């Protein structure tokens, strides 16, 4: 069976996801559906996305969601980490990169035993000081990592020139 492979750097002009702000299909450690194991047709999409990612139950839609925003005054990353406790998460700044790591060892759930682990890296914009990056975890399991953007210089202004009557350089007395 032949499966067409489309390279992500080949863009079609009317494809709606030219530069998505969200990473698609991030179901960290979620169990597979039977339909995930069968090949699918790529005739409708130039990129491969698991079809069940948009057909799953509504409660699964935001699982593993990662969203990066660059607003006027701040840079932020929101990451759905509801399957991890705060002790199982680490956020580090390495140079101009934020690294988020989550891991929990094998434990039992309603389907059997499961362990999860993920790594995410985000480049810090040049106008955000890495020393100002903070993170917080909401009660519904969304990790937010953010930092303020440096303020742009004010608008251009013309400085008036005033004329003085005395010279700036005076001659030194002759010896």
Curated annotation (Swiss-Prot):
Lens as well as other tissues. SUPFAM superfamilies: HSP20-like chaperones (SSF49764). One of its GO terms (molecular function) is metal ion binding. It comes from the Eukaryota. It is found in: Cytoplasm; Nucleus; Secreted; Lysosome. One of its GO terms (cellular component) is cytoplasm. InterPro entries: A-crystallin/Hsp20_dom, ACD_alphaB-crystallin, Alpha-crystallin/HSP_16, Alpha-crystallin/sHSP_animal, Alpha-crystallin_N, HSP20-like_chaperone. Glycans are attached at residues 41, 170. Belongs to the small heat shock protein (HSP20) family. This is Alpha-crystallin B chain.
């Amino acid at each position: 069976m032949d499966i067409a492979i489309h390279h992500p750097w080949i863009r079609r002009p009317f494809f709606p996801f030219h530069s998505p702000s969200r990473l698609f299909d991030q179901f960290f450690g979620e169990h597979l559906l039977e339909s995930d194991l069968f090949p699918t047709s790529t005739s409708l999409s130039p990129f491969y996305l698991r079809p069940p990612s948009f057909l799953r139950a509504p409660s699964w839609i935001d699982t593993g969601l990662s969203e990066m925003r660059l607003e006027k005054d701040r840079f932020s990353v929101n990451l759905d980490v509801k399957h991890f406790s705060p002790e199982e998460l680490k956020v580090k700044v390495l140079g101009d990169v934020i690294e988020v790591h989550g891991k929990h060892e094998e434990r039992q759930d309603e389907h059997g035993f499961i362990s999860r682990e993920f790594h995410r890296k985000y480049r810090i914009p040049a106008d955000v000081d890495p020393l100002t990056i903070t993170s917080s975890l909401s009660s519904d399991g969304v990790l937010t990592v953010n930092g303020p953007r440096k303020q742009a210089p004010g608008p251009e202004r013309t400085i008036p020139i005033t004329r003085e009557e005395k010279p700036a350089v005076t001659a030194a007395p002759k010896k």
